[in-house]
Amino acid sequence: MESGRRPIVPYTGPVPDVKKLLTENRFARLADLVVPLEVLGETDFVRHIHAQFENLSRDEMDELVLARTVAINSAPSLFSILLMAEETCSYFSAIDRLDIPVNPYDPYASTLSALKHATFSKLNVAKLSCMMSNGERPPSASSDYDFLKKIASGNGATVKSFSRSSESTVAPFPAATKQVPDISDIREFDFETFRHPFQKVICFLATIEKVISEIKGHRAPGCIAGGPINPKDRSRYIRDYDKQGIMRRYKDGCIIGLVKQGFCEHACNDNACRRRCKFALSVPYNLGMVFCPPTENSSVEDMDAYFERNRCPTRNGSFDDSRSATSGDGSSCSSAHKVTTPTDGVMMPEFPFSDQTDTSNNGTVRFSERRVSSSSKHRRRSNKHISPLDRPNDYHYQKNQPTPSDEKRYYHGSGSSSTEAVSTASAPLTGSAANQHPQHCGGQSGSDTGVISRGEGRHHGSHNGIPDFVSRSPVTTPPEVFSPERRSSEERSSSDQRRKSPLSRSASATSGGSKRRSFVDSPPRHESEDEDEDSDSSSSEAQKDRFKKRSGSRSNTPPSSPSKPDSAPAASASPGGDGGNDSDDGATEKGVTSNAKESVRVSERFETGDKSPTFIETEDESDDEDDQMSITSYDHSESSSAESGSETDGEDGESDMTL
């Protein structure tokens, strides 16, 4: 052992499992991984880490190398990269101090190049041309900055984009005020040559990279691979390659101190420089996305579950090992540990994505609670942590609700069909019923039709028989921006009717009231009735005669409806009424069942799968603009007319006819 070094004592404490920590699916708390400086400098702690790499197979070693490479490339901030660089430099410094042969294929040695470039990239978020100018004008012509780029260039050769040449027409960077020497081997420079703290940080990483490169058998220094060297002439000890003793100048924990020194010593009046320094030292609190395009797979749910389940602690602040599929017992830690940043008096958040600057609420708001509010308006469905982007399965609740009647009506759409229970009375849910069915009353609608109430969400239709419902979170756009206007101003002004039963609503629809009627509201088909009466020619003529009679009975009202196409008479036939039953007085139940056979014809035509447009008849005696025949396209969703017709049911008594 060389003079001037402290004696090494055996380490008897717990040794971390490198395979578990690098491959398990959870974010370990840094407070549990901190090793005191006395342990690193005075014991052989690193020897136990090195021994674990020596006992791994080739496949296991490749898995650990890939896991660490992905962790470096996906590091969220400068501090995370600096901690990785600190760990790597401490590891190789202890290897040199303990005189242990280097394994050039372990995860630390195999990821040196990626770590060096990642460190430079994170530092370069700040305006390094201004921070390293040393009074040079313009700041972009900083010679120290050009020297830093050459150190981090990889193979030590001169890069054309880093200096102006006489042959080039466009120079990406201005020429430096001082001549920057070319770097064939970084170990040829004295450590005092690197004046700026950022240069010293990159120098440590680049020196280790050159040493590992030669240990692997590369003839030329750097990343240029040459022929293999005779194993007898190749050594695996760092002391045989570090002639300048740069690694001996490294002190455990000095990387963070050098970066702090570089930022604290700089002072300027450039607003862009201050802004870039702020972002370079910050930890991202979000994904940097303004909107998320729709995807055909579950990538949105998987990404949201990744951030909210793996990166967020529990509500009490302690780390929850149950979030990890591979985490073991005894690895949890209390929330009393805090990780400090290089800046004085500033505490890093307990996890990478905490939000301590959110001023929308009084106090600190976690990342998991930013998009899902805990208020009564946006209350979660259960005590489990539900992602705000997860769409709840509303069909599950509708499917489990008891049907009031065994009679069912079948709806046929474009290539899909669904069933819905039909009740003889569709009165609104009372207070007790609303409490029993919070899924329909609290967060969505006041009826069983699945229509979303205003202000709580919006309905996107259905997919595979299951309606899609997206609950509105505090950061989403209000539904008034996306959802169309439910009712027109004319319908609001003319809605003065009280809530009626389905029977009276169907009767009033035949008497010229302000109600709609469509094919989907027709009674179900009874197979016991005579089907031979329906033919294409006779049915079409009967529909035309009935339409003429209805038009003649309403001659007192000025006609304002547009002309109908040829298929209009067949489509405008109402299943519940005839020309003789269109009186303005209150209609009775007889008006609904007087023409059962004619209704069956219309129902049979609908059930044959004809996808012709649905004609909805709108009649209003008080408003001429509403008295017209509006043509609407076929509703291919599974919700049928019960969703589109009863969305305003319960407000001023205006609702569509539903059975």
UniProtKB/Swiss-Prot annotation:
Transcription keyword on record: yes
Pfam families in alphabetical order: Herpes_UL69 (PF05459)
Region (Disordered): 317-659
Ranges of biased composition (kind: Low complexity): 324-336, 413-427, 553-575
Bias type Polar residues, positions: 354-365, 503-513
GO annotation, biological process: regulation of DNA-templated transcription
Gene Ontology MF terms: zinc ion binding
Protein name: mRNA export factor ICP27 homolog
